């Protein structure tokens, strides 16, 4: 319940409830499996899987089906491919893996957040349920061979899992916090913690005077966690022990209640409070409430168009989720539980009925999982991009889809045929990234330790002795022009390199230790001395993502000076217009090319680079009129979609803009083109460095 309340009323803060949930899962299942294995020498796998299917998979499958149907009806078509992928992943209990694969970190709810994001923790739990029986059987087998008790052997194995996973979580947090938060390997220690509570329960008994203080302390630790700690940044590291130790204290306080004068057991007040009928009833609905609340929240935000949830919206989502959880418990969970429950005075299930029950349950489970796998196959077939192995615009009719080269006398979005659908298709747009981003050489956004390393993307074409080496560097806005540069490179014998870090522009930052962008800037200077490109191309201005006017980033000139001091020619490109909302989503939701366009008034009246103090020899190029012809921005130009999200250009539009980029470069940097090129103003000199004139390069030398 705490997880739900923090999601709805706490701006999505991590409450620690998931950590407690995982520990309780380990507590309950370890004890149950160990008792069965010790008694029978094995685990009745069909009964075990059938019980899981009835109690866990069936309600989850219902919510997944309902969420998928609602999402396909309500969410923009641009999000359908990811929706189906995550529905399949949730059904197969690998949603945490899908979120990592898709580079979607755990975050507070917003208009573009996945409605299946909360299934990551259920996926960790489901993977535990499939793996843990093998560990229990191993413990029983080892116990019989060594003469030790199964509980003692299991305790040793679980302690090993706990220690290994805890150390792995600690290590991986320093590499990638977003992945560490979602990975099963870094979460296993929390499940092992609960398992150890089950195995060592007999040793958790507290002296009577300590039980009530321990219960209050434990409850305080669990409840306060979400208010005190930033779980999204700290978990599953050592700070996750905060709520887990609270759980341990509560269990220790409840394990042996105090007794009155007549020897009647009396639990400490916090335990009695948690066992009251209303809370017990709410506990019956907890699983369904958790399943329903997140998709209800995301659908509510989509329907209302809100960026976040206010108090009124939170109440609406909570009431709906409670009603849906009650209905699920009443008509799904309870009937399935009764279906598999023992009957008759003996408390056992008739053997024939048990076999039919298990066959039916497992058939339903297998069918559900097969459906998930089939959905994934269809999804992959539908969303495979056609640009692999060639240009995104290869074979495109440029008469129908002129893109950026549409006639200057035509309005933005002009088409020879008004009925022509924009290119490319909006579905899967977010995955149509530039070529370099498909390789493991783009440094990710954020301040996770280890993200300061400069990763260099080599030219994707066959190695050759290029006439000039040109490096696109800085944030991703430098990289999204890659395809246009590659097109020109084929014609003019250039080598195109890319060195980017998401969200990081060139600027001077003192605190390198705690700011990975600052450290990346410093490392870039060292890399520049080693690689020595002839030209470095980087954005010169920036429009803040949360509003504000275009400007030069503070401290950028210092880094630009370092680049020219290293002997490279610097080319500054004016920043790309930015929209506050996702452009393909806007188009898919019924918006037109004008209403979904970036806000042109966020541009400075004149290019800030014109009056700025720049390093000697720096060249500048303004591509604003390429993205916003005639001073008017549009989401679709020449029947080609301009943006793949709110601020990155599509590969397709960038490729149509290559001729316009060449025109601009011939005006600004004619020395890039050799004497054989039309429009060249001077013959080439010997050596790549000598091709830069003194006027462009300034007084610097290599």
Language-model features: locations:
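Membrane-interface helix/loop caps of multi-pass membrane proteins
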Residues: 1-358, 367-369, 679
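Extracellular/periplasmic envelope-modification machinery, especially enzymes
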Residues: 231, 304-308, 322, 330, ...
């Amino acid at each position: 319940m705490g997880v739900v309340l923090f999601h709805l009323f706490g701006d999505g803060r991590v409450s620690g409830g998931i950590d407690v949930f995982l520990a309780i899962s380990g507590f309950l299942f370890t004890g149950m499996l160990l008792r069965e294995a010790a008694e029978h020498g094995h685990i009745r796998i069909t009964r075990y899987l059938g019980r899981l299917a009835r109690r866990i998979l069936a309600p989850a499958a219902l919510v997944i089906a309902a969420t998928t149907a609602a999402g396909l009806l309500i969410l923009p078509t641009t999000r359908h491919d990811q929706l189906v992928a995550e529905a399949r992943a949730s059904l197969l209990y690998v949603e945490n893996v899908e979120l990592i694969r898709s580079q979607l970190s755990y975050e507070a709810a917003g208009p573009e957040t996945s409605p299946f994001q909360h299934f990551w923790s259920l996926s960790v739990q489901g993977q535990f349920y499939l793996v843990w029986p093998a560990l229990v059987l191993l413990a029983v087998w080892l116990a019989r061979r060594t003469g030790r008790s199964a509980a003692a052997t299991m305790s040793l194995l679980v302690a090993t899992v706990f220690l290994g996973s805890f150390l792995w979580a600690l290590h991986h947090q320093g590499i990638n916090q977003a992945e560490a938060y979602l990975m099963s390997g870094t979460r296993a220690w929390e499940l092992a913690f609960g398992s150890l509570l089950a195995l060592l329960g007999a040793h958790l008994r507290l002296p009577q005077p300590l039980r009530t203080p321990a219960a209050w302390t434990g409850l305080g630790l669990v409840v306060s966690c979400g208010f005190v700690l930033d779980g999204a940044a700290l978990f599953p590291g050592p700070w996750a022990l905060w709520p887990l130790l609270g759980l341990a204290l509560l269990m220790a306080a409840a394990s042996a209640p105090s007794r009155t004068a007549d020897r009647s057991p009396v639990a400490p007040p916090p335990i009695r409070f948690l066992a009251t009928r209303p809370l017990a009833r709410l506990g019956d609905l907890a699983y369904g409430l958790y399943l329903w609340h997140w998709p209800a929240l995301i659908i509510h935000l989509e329907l209302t168009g809100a960026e976040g949830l206010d108090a009124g919206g939170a109440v609406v989502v909570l009431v709906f989720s409670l009603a849906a959880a009650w209905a699920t418990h009443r008509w799904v969970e309870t009937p399935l539980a009764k279906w598999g429950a023992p009957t008759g005075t003996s408390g056992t299930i008739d053997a024939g009925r048990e076999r039919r029950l298990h066959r039916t349950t497992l058939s339903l489970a297998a069918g559900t999982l097969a459906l998930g796998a089939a959905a994934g196959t269809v999804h992959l077939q539908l969303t495979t991009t056609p640009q692999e192995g060639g240009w995104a615009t290869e074979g495109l009719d440029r008469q129908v889809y002129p893109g950026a080269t549409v006639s200057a006398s035509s309005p933005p979005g002009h088409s020879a045929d008004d009925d022509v659908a924009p290119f490319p298709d909006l579905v899967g747009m977010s995955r149509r990234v530039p070529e370099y981003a498909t390789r493991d050489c783009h440094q990710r956004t954020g301040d996770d330790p280890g993200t300061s390393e400069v990763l260099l993307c080599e030219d994707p074409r066959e190695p050759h002795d290029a006439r000039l080496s040109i490096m696109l560097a800085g944030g991703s806005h430098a990289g999204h022009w890659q395809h246009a540069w590659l097109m020109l490179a084929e014609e003019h014998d250039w080598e195109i390199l890319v060195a980017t870090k998401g969200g990081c522009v060139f600027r001077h930052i003192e605190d390198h230790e705690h700011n990975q962008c600052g450290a990346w800037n410093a490392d870039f200077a060292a890399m520049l001395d080693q690689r020595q490109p002839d030209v470095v191309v980087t954005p010169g201005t920036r429009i803040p993502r949360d509003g504000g006017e275009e400007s030069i980033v503070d401290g950028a000139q210092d880094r630009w000076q370092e680049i020219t001091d290293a002997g490279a020619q610097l080319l500054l490109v004016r920043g790309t217009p930015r929209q506050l909302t996702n452009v393909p989503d806007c188009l898919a939701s019924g918006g037109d090319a004008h209403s979904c366009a970036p806000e042109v008034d966020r541009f400075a009246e004149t290019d800030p680079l014109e009056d700025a103090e720049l390093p000697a020899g720096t060249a500048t190029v303004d591509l604003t009129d390429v993205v916003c012809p005639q001073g008017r921005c549009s989401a679709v130009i020449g029947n080609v979609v301009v943006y793949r999200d709110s601020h990155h250009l599509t590969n397709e539009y960038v490729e149509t803009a290559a001729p316009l980029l060449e025109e601009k470069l011939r005006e600004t940097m004619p020395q890039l083109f050799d004497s054989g090129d039309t429009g060249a103003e001077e013959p080439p000199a010997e050596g790549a460095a000598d091709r830069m004139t003194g006027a462009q390069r300034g007084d610097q030398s290599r």
